């Protein structure tokens, strides 16, 4: 299973090296430019949860840490100002101003994605790093986890290898990986899970490779614990060809097992809303940041107006112009591809002109003719329909979750949906688009070099225009 092919040696080593080179050159600059302030999406919440895990049962907060938790950002426009901010925050880290005691040291299932960041925060605290260094060091745990998991996703992929490497090197995925967030864990784990599933489904032998199957189920599950909306993806395992060669009893056991796993994880998302609806707790499930939001009242509204709700959901998904990226009207003026791949959150998004590089490169990689691609294109019609159904249901659940929790009750548009939520299903979507009619024939090595060049141009442009220009020079 883990043996390099001849084609891999000439192409994939180069691609993987490119991924590490991009991560090594750009991600630390993203970390450094963000010190010590919140710049990514809800970074104050993610830092708080990671810091609590790192602190054990007794959590001690300093003024600097509470500034981050409360997102008290001080804007810096020069190197000198940034240095002053670091010194200021380091001084505010000298005295403990608040303590809290957690009920247990056990980590909640939906907080497992914070472990890489928490481990590095714990190490940094043991080393007594100044706060600015500690804040950056915690992000390093997230980055290393991302590189490790994506390395194996690219390494093990039998199809669309270069596409995976290209996406892994783009500005937004690397920016997320060098921030406090669970998004990079969700993205990388689900992507690797899809890779292992695709190996067994399209390129497997007559028997399961049991470690791959178990690992895929594990990765899907862990990747979905922080965002349960992706859990339908675990049902892809029922498409494994070997499943249909089992006895009726074995099929039933596998079916029940997958079904139970699906419903247990979905229950973490659905049951609290249903139980609070039944009990009449109308305030449950609102956005903690404010606004007239309530998952319970929104669900009641949907039940009262089912057709309008379905029409709103379907319209929102297919219009592609309703991504509320930063909560500002001007954030919707960007091409959704730029919002997904060329976006540095509060730092801004690269202008639409850069999609002239992004779109053609993505098209080449998605429709690249490669060895074994015909196996995917000729997959039986039931399997394709089933996989597309899972893909669509997952997308709909993303929008439903945002409609319930982040959209004011009765609003005629869905707020809170961001294009980065689509990242975990990008690889699956690329596989499903494989067909026997649209093919791009180009040498793999040439395509790998081209993708590396384009990814680095976009990365350099993002770092220059969004982080450095007019600020730190």
Task: List PLM regions with ranges.
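Transmembrane-helix signature of polytopic, membrane-embedded enzymes
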Residues: 129-132, 150-171
